[in-house]
């Protein structure tokens, strides 16, 4: 039964978002690990990026698109929004190609975790959730998780992309325990930021 709910919730995630949006403030200290370098020196760009994450986790792609584009208006040097926006652009379009080019250009001086994240764009576009999920994506997320096990976005997509439904459920439950109860592998527990806005989407995915 849980497997069925998991599959259905991947398609129909979206409830319980308002409380999450109230938490859409950037309180993350990137100096605590080798995370994907999403942060900007521009506070408005950070606010837009964090708001985009809330919509992304709740599969509100049109809204996520708006906020990621706004983040780039405030800080064109960011690479992270370009990765997501490439996947939201029509396949094979000039817009997709532009976002891929900009992501690779802007990540050149960033850390290894960030470069592996951008390398998701090198995977074939064979999934509606490309480049974050699809053939080959789990290997990339696994590499990122090895580089920085505390990263919660990394853990989320590591769990979502892992082969096998039982494995997906197990990893999502582990992530939920970390976020909601502060229980889990000490190397994986978050040490900075408020990730509570991720709890409801994970609960929805699990079908609880």
Mark where each language-model region is:
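Alpha-helical repeat scaffolds
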Residues: 95-107, 132-145, 168-183
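Residue-level recognition of tetratricopeptide repeat
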Residues: 44, 77-79, 148-154, 186, ...
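Bacterial signal peptide processing site
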Residues: 16-18
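C-terminal motif of bacterial Sec signal peptides marking the signal peptidase cleavage site
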Residues: 12-14
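Alpha-helical segment of the N-proximal tetratricopeptide repeat
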Residues: 41-67, 118-132
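TPR-adjacent "capping" and linker segments in tetratricopeptide-repeat scaffold/adaptor proteins
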Residues: 31-47, 106-117, 190-196
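Alpha-solenoid helical repeat scaffolds
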Residues: 49, 80-84, 115-118, 156-157, ...
